[in-house]
Regions:
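Periplasmic/extracellular electron-transfer cofactor-ligation site
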Residues: 49-63, 135
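N-terminal "domain-start" segment that seeds a small globular fold
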Residues: 19-34
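Short, flexible loop segments at the rims of nucleotide/cofactor-binding pockets, characterized by
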Residues: 21-22, 56, 105-107
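Bacterial Sec-dependent N-terminal signal peptides
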Residues: 1-23
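Short active-site neighborhood of thiol/selenol oxidoreductases, capturing the structured segment around
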Residues: 38-55, 77
Length: 184
C-alpha cells in the first residue's frame, strides 16, 4: 500500500510540474526594453479570441514544458490580440485599432500592428507566430497551428539564425530533435 501511495504521490508531483509549464509573456513595449539589456529575438503569438487553433496552440504548444522552457530561455515572448483595442509602440511607431468596436463578440477590426507584422503574401491568418530580431527587424511571420514537435525546428531555425544561410527545406532534411519530454 505504501508503494502504491508513493507512486501516486510521485505521479501527481510530476503531473503538476508538467502542467505548470508556462511561457513568460511580456508586452511588446517590455520586450523592446528587455532587448536593450539582454539581446534576444522576439516571438509574437498573434491570436484572436474567436480562433480555435489559437486556443489549441495556447493549450498544447505553449504549455508544453520543452517548448515553454526553450522560448523563455531564447526569446522574449509577446501574446498579441490581433483585434484588440490597446495601442502599442513598436520601433518608435504608434499603432492603434481605430475600427475596434468595444463589447463586440466574434470578429472585430484588425489592429494596425497586426497589419504591419502578420501578413503572408498579403493575407492575415490566425494564429500567426511572428519572429523579430534583436534590432527590431521582422524575420518572418509563420501562419497556422503548430504542434510542439512541429514548433521545435522553427524555434531553433530562427534562434540559431539558420535562416541567414539555409532554406527551410534543407534545414528540415538534417534536423534532429532533442526534445526530452513526450510530444504533445
Amino acid at each position: 500500500m505504501k508503494k502504491i501511495r508513493s507512486i501516486l504521490t510521485l505521479s501527481l508531483v510530476m503531473l503538476t510540474m508538467v502542467s505548470m509549464a508556462q511561457v513568460n509573456w511580456v508586452s511588446i513595449e517590455e520586450a523592446q526594453e528587455l532587448i536593450k539589456k539582454e539581446p534576444k529575438k522576439i516571438l509574437i503569438d498573434v491570436y484572436t479570441k474567436w480562433c480555435g487553433p489559437c486556443k489549441m496552440m495556447t493549450k498544447f504548444t505553449f504549455n508544453d514544458k520543452w517548448t515553454s522552457d526553450y522560448i523563455n530561455e531564447n526569446y522574449y515572448a509577446v501574446k498579441w490580440d490581433a483585434e484588440g483595442p490597446d495601442s502599442c509602440t513598436f520601433d518608435n511607431k504608434l499603432f492603434t485599432n481605430p475600427g475596434h468596436v468595444a463589447g463586440k463578440s466574434g470578429r472585430n477590426s484588425t489592429h494596425q500592428f497586426t497589419e504591419a507584422i502578420a501578413p503572408v503574401k498579403g493575407r492575415i491568418a490566425y494564429p500567426t507566430i511572428v519572429f523579430i530580431d534583436e534590432n527590431l527587424n521582422l524575420i518572418t511571420p509563420v501562419q497556422g497551428y503548430q504542434k510542439p514537435d512541429q514548433f521545435e525546428p522553427m524555434l531553433k531555425f530562427i534562434k540559431e539564425e539558420m535562416y541567414k544561410t539555409s532554406n527551410w527545406n534543407d534545414y528540415m532534411k538534417t534536423f534532429k530533435s532533442d526534445r526530452s519530454v513526450t510530444k504533445g
